[in-house]
A protein has these predicted regions:
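A short alpha-helix capping/helix-coil boundary motif
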Residues: 156-159, 199-201
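Hydrophobic faces of well-ordered beta-strands that scaffold small-molecule active sites
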Residues: 158-165, 190-194
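Aromatic- and carboxylate-enriched substrate-binding clefts and catalytic-loop regions
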Residues: 188-203
Length: 203
């Protein structure tokens, strides 16, 4: 089951493709101050999954993450923000549920870092939509989440082949030279991806 809770005046992100009525009852599981902060009391055995593209392990507990896309080429163990923001978490423990924070601004996730028994989520402003998802198990919760955000497209056949990418290709000749070298070495090559060098001022 998915329930939608609206706070303030959210900016439409179009992340959710399914129309849904706003719930009238109190937000379950999470305590909020109605200022953009959401707290959840973590039990000793709770495991927290999610947040998509992030450094560190699959269990996000014990660290701070920031949803504020950051083009940092030097990824380290203490990095808190990467290229993408995926504000979905799934908690497995005494209570199992998912939460998606549909918000276009900066969000901070303190998942048992400051206090081991507390997960604190902060949005820069209290203008967001929170979706609470419950189900039979973790797989069911993720399936429901994927349904509301839209399923991924099926990749083309060539995308399963070998691709080459790196920062630093400046010209068409650079790309052709890479392809020629792969061919000379007898290494199959299905695609060459360009990094930001071809863009005007990297945009």
């Amino acid at each position: 089951m998915i329930k939608k809770y609206v706070f303030g005046t959210p900016f439409p992100t179009n992340a959710v493709v399914t129309e849904m009525e706003t719930a009238k009852d109190k937000l379950p599981f999470l305590e909020t101050d109605n200022q953009g902060t959401f707290n959840y009391a973590l039990s000793e055995n709770d495991i927290v999954y999610g947040l998509g593209e992030q450094i560190r392990g699959i269990n996000k507990r014990g660290w701070q993450y920031v949803s504020w896309n950051y083009d940092n080429p030097n990824h380290h163990e203490d990095t808190r923000s990467l290229y993408g923001s995926h504000n979905f978490i799934l908690i497995r423990g005494d209570v199992t549920f998912g939460a998606f924070f549909d918000y276009a601004g900066k969000m901070e996730f303190d998942i048992g870092y400051t206090r081991r028994d507390l997960m604190q989520i902060k949005a820069a402003k209290n203008d967001l939509v929170v979706y609470i998802i419950t189900g039979e198990n973790e797989k069911d919760i993720v399936k429901q989440f994927r349904k509301i955000i839209g399923r991924s497209y099926i990749p083309p056949f060539w995308a399963f082949g070998y691709g080459q990418s790196r920062w630093g290709y400046k010209t068409e000749q650079d790309i052709r030279e890479v392809a020629k070298r792969y061919q000379a070495a007898g290494i199959p090559l299905d695609s060459i991806y360009l990094d930001i060098d071809y863009m005007e001022r990297y945009k």
